[in-house]
Amino acid sequence: MAEPYLIEKLQSVEQTFQDLTRRLADPEIATDPREFQRVARMRSSMEELVTTYEEWKQRDAELKGAREILRESSGDPELREMAALEVNELEALLVSLEERLKILLLPRDPNDDKNIMLEIRAGTGGDEASLWAGDLLRMYSRYAESQGWRVKLLSESTGELGGYKEAILEIQGESVYSKLKFEAGVHRVQRVPATEAGGRVHTSTATVAIMPEVDEVEVSIDPKDIELTTARSGGAGGQNVNKVETAVDLFHKPTGIRIFCTEERSQLQNRERAMQILRAKLYEMKLQEQQEAVSSMRRSQVGTGSRSEKIRTYNYKDNRATDHRLGLNFSLNPVLEGEIEEVIQACISKDQTEQLAQMAQDQEAAKV
């Protein structure tokens, strides 16, 4: 039998779902398209939970019936065996449905459906760190392609021997943030650099930041805080390259954030793109503050998404990628080729398990 607090929550969601269904059937709402869309989205977000709860109620009723038959079938061994088998199957199914219901009841991250900007910065390790940042960019590009997402390079600062000192990708598609948010943090590589004549293993790092895309309404920027200069672009631009100042160098005075955009074809487009990146960076800073406040109350083992948190080590000698949050090893080569879905799903599962444990703990505390 599901815990009483779970039943109460499910009944409350079911009631809200029914209220929203009636609201959508009201002819008056058709006169306000924006309100209609808002209500329809809310109802849609609850549909899987309500459908699963309906199935749970149906199976729970079937279990009660099967147990009743089991009690009354002492004189019929064949019927008793069938009833016992059905009871076992239904009990297992109800446990599975209850776990699913708990996961569906977890609060949803409002950013999960958003597109992202993925920033990779070379850390310790000099030229080798830049090469490693380039390898990570390739890994994420490959993974994004496997998911059917669209990838575009927005900004780059190349390393002297290749790779990137810094690069920003725009990744668009279904539920991008919900998966890649677990990739934020420090990625450490242990390998013999191509520049190392002695064959010694070096350790280098690169930091990954995952920034959900935001609009102007979500982040307000005072124009007085922006210092903007232009330069000749060395990027796309055809006949305009090095003749017209299409590149934009944007500096945000309060935070010290500097963004250099050259990838678009006009100065206006590069300015808009730089502002878009700035909004995402400022929003991510706000998210970091919120997550640090939450993590002080609930220390997540999956990770806080902090830029300073070492999340994974890629060891070339042992052909092993170790995720430190999970305490699990993965084969290195497939991971570097972008086959990281297994890692990400393991992070999602662990995060859900932690949230469920916190939910149960909160319920116990409420009883005291």
UniProtKB/Swiss-Prot annotation:
Its localization reads: Cytoplasm
Q: What is this protein called?
A: Peptide chain release factor 1
| Stated role | Peptide chain release factor 1 directs the termination of translation in response to the peptide chain termination codons UAG and UAA.
Q: What is the originating organism of this protein?
A: Synechococcus elongatus (strain ATCC 33912 / PCC 7942 / FACHB-805) (Anacystis nidulans R2)
The GO terms describing molecular function are:
translation release factor activity, codon specific
Q: Which family does it belong to?
A: Belongs to the prokaryotic/mitochondrial release factor family.
Report the domain of life of the source organism.
Answer: Bacteria
What Gene3D superfamilies is this protein classified in? 3.30.160.20, 3.30.70.1660, 6.10.140.1950
Pfam families, per the entry = PCRF, RF-1
Principal location class: cytoplasm
